Amino acid sequence: MTVLQKIQSLREELNLHNYNYYVLDNPTISDYDFDVKLTDLQSLEKNNPEYFDENSPTQRVGGTITKNFETLKHDYRMYSLDNSYSKEDLLDWENRIQKALGDVPLEYICELKYDGASISITYENGRLVRAVTRGDGFQGDDVTNNIKTIKAVPIKLKGDFPEKFDIRGEIILPFAGFEKMNQDLIEIGETPYSNPRNTASGSLKLQDSAEVAKRPLDCLLYSLIGNNLPFQSHFEGLEKARLWGFKVPKQSHLAKNMNEVFDFINIWDKNRHTLPYETDGVVIKVNDLHLQDELGYTAKSPRWAIAYKFKSEQVFTQLNSISYQVGRTGSITPVANLEPVQLAGTIVKRASLHNADQIEKLDIRINDTVFVEKGGEIIPKIIGVDLQKRPSNSQKTAYITHCPECQTKLERKEGEANHYCPNFYGCRPQIIGRIQHYISRKAMDIEGLGGETVALLYDNGLVKNYADLYDLSVEQILPLERMAQKSAENLVQGVQNSKNIPFENVLFALGIRYVGETVAKKLAKHYKNIDAIANANLLELVMVDEIGDKIAQSVVEFFDNQENISVLERLKNNGIQLAISEENNTVVSNKLLGKIFVVSGVFEIYSRDELKKAIEDNGGKVGSSISAKTNYVIAGQNMGPAKLEKANQLKVSIISESDFSALLTS
């Protein structure tokens, strides 16, 4: 077998495994075996760049930067649907159809209406060539690079597919992924996303496709459009699409008459909460494509389809009290304590009130009868008050002025929605929350130590900050509740092992507000050690790539706090990694200091990653796009014509990889 044949074989095999895992939900190999095959393919492609293929499974991780999303015209207009809210509306719709068509037998396709971001994907000769958002229906944004990172979207089709066609669908964010993303945001003191739909839609417009690849997006496809397609009905088209490799929802149902449509609606109105993603109704379509053509379109929607919207999941109950939670960053979150009520298949006792502005906007008061809804079918929220049931002695809610835990006066910065407790080192939930964040998996990853144990250690006076962890002994821990010799030894050993955790993880573990994993990596890479970050001023920090005013101000405030500096000194004395280690800090020279490079194309001597590393190791900076600040473009084979044109317009030096090697050796 030749190298090319090996590469092609691995690509086909990995595409099949992706299909089995992400579309059929039926993996046939382990994650480990998949990763081994993917690594083999990456190695072969790296050593044989002449066989580069943008549609290879190795390109699913993203990495393309899109500064401006080009507007593209849809080959076929993306219409919206008329909505119906009752079965009478559906019967009226059927009567209009029968009046237009005459006395012909009708079959309907029933599909769940997914609440996500609509997308139109074009395939030519079995390959994905472009993906465009709905936009205004006539034109949308080109998000091809981002769509390619979604594993459920096939890059290359299989079977007897047509030469060219569009397929429409919905990009969705399953509940579990949405909850995980929000939990990660809450851990770093950021505001969580409002709902899965908006988060999915916003994800498609992220500039860095590598960031899109990290998000657990899914894609459900439900409509084919094109010329001379090899089927006569909508249902047959869906069956074909499945065979070609598309993820078509298995809930789609062929109904022989309107009574069967009603049965489908009734079933899913009751069972929609069992699904892993948002649905807000059912779409009903005439099945026969010839009849669809005959019915045609109004100015904004197809006559042959209609959406039935489920009633919003709302209940009313009494607001018994409002409590206030303190997060690890000091952020105050008001919580409504409700008379227990069933909503969307679960018993709801509490709902978030978000902040003081939300309470004032809705004029929410204790003992009110409130309307509760599950936002995105997940997070209960109060959406209104039944004023007719408000008690005559009702008092307007006065938002707390002092911390409910430590009684410190709260602060609210200009432009921020939340109030904060400034008692950073004296407020129990802040201290415990900060230590819990420090030990977490993505931070110091301390085994043998969990959140409840942290609270136990604090309440027994053994720790007041994360530096105290390194002074713990087995003898101190043993007397604590639920502690045995082995668990105490494991805890102490886990703490000691954390001394080997890299600097970027340590920086994230410190719990600086707005400094998440990505920002911590940027700061660690730029400044190399904690002292350099501590000494940086506001202006210097905002000059770092992707560091804005809010993050920079938070970093400055953290290092201006003398207690923080004292804790850092103790961490340093305990051997914590507060600088990039020599093996990771591979700066070879400063020959390229101050120079900005853009790398584009396929190369023979270096891989793209090797070029970027060589630039940074010699003091240079890698840019994501060509601008007036770019000094050099290193051009390989198949460099994009748009980049080439822009480089020439801006008179940026275009060099080969051989020229780059000469720069390093000069």
UniProtKB/Swiss-Prot annotation:
Keyword line: DNA damage, DNA repair, DNA replication, Ligase, Magnesium, Manganese, Metal-binding, NAD, Zinc
CDD domains: BRCT_DNA_ligase_like (cd17748), LIGANc (cd00114)
Domain BRCT: 587-666
Protein name as catalogued: DNA ligase
Residues where Zn(2+) binds: C403, C406, C421, C427
A Gene Ontology molecular function term of the record: DNA ligase (NAD+) activity
Entry keyword Plastid: no
Cofactor: Mg(2+); Mn(2+)
Biological process, per Gene Ontology: DNA repair; DNA replication
EC code: 6.5.1.2
Taxonomic source organism: Flavobacterium psychrophilum (strain ATCC 49511 / DSM 21280 / CIP 103535 / JIP02/86)
HAMAP family, per database record: DNA_ligase_A
Similarity remark: Belongs to the NAD-dependent DNA ligase family. LigA subfamily.
GN (gene name): ligA
Annotated NAD(+) binding sites: D31, Y32, D33, F34, D35, S80, L81, E111, R134, E170, K285, K309
Reactions performed catalytically: NAD(+) + (deoxyribonucleotide)n-3'-hydroxyl + 5'-phospho-(deoxyribonucleotide)m = (deoxyribonucleotide)n+m + AMP + beta-nicotinamide D-nucleotide
Highest taxon listed in the record's lineage: Bacteria
A Pfam family reported for this protein in Swiss-Prot or TrEMBL: DNA_ligase_OB
